Amino acid sequence: MIYLILSGISAFFGLTAGLGTTTLLRPLLDAVSPLEPASVAMLCTMATLGAALVTAFFALGRPLPLHPDELMLLAIGASLGGVLGDLASARFFSSLTRSSAMLLQNALLFTIIALPSVYFGQLSHMLPPLRANRLFSLPTAFAVGLLGSFLSFGATPLTLMLYAFLFAADEEESTIAALTVSLFAMTGKLIVLLIRQRFQLPDADALLWLLPGAVGGSLLAMLPALQGRQAGVGNALLRLSLFTSLLNIAAALT
């Protein structure tokens, strides 16, 4: 039941704030779940993918702000990053203890969440956007997909920051780019994960609670009355996610 509640709340507030499903769910599961890091990674992957599919379904009913060629570059880069990220995480974390794996994961997660928080809070007023060629969306999606897959985390805040800084993208463009990267990175990761697990998902009983929560929370966030990014909710969610990551780091060090 706790997985249903946590995934539903994380998906609802994450999508309402425009920051993705697992921005809060990832550190929360590290904090409260007794499962092994590999099982937590699988749960977060499925939650991210389920919520991304719901969001993509509703997004297809509106004109897309990005050119189809750019969406293709994002999909290719994110898929490759997702595949390589899962291979890297499986090899890397298999040699670590649970506490060491949690320490590294949450240190990286804290950094990835803190950077966009600092950028949108202060640096965006000081650093002018680069307005780079949109062809660079391919390596950008690859890098974000690699990190997101490595941490089993959609990395939506990182995509939003990079698209705003590198391409001077508006909110709608950045949101669609983040959705595309999250969707294809997690798809690539899931394919490799299933092959490694011989198409058997560990801790499927927890998944049966978590996935309905993620999908249900996403559907609620898609209600017309709740559309539009909520800055106050987003700031609170980022702070809570950072605080939870710090608690996980402290727990791993003790």
Task: Label the predicted regions.
Residues P37-M42, T175-L179:
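Small-residue hotspots at the loop-to-helix junctions and early N-terminal turns
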Residues A17-L25, L151-L162:
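Transmembrane helix boundary and interhelical junction motifs in multipass membrane proteins
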Residues M1-L15, G20, R26-S39, T55-L146, ...:
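Juxtamembrane transmembrane-helix boundary motif
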Residues C44-T48, A178-S182, A206-L207, L211:
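Short hydrophobic/aromatic, small-residue-rich stretches within specific transmembrane helices
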Residues P128-A132, T156, L160, A164, ...:
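Functional transmembrane core segments of multi-pass inner-membrane proteins
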Residues S174-V192:
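Hydrophobic alpha-helical transmembrane segments of multi-pass integral membrane proteins
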Residues M42-F58:
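Transmembrane alpha-helices of multi-pass small-molecule transport proteins
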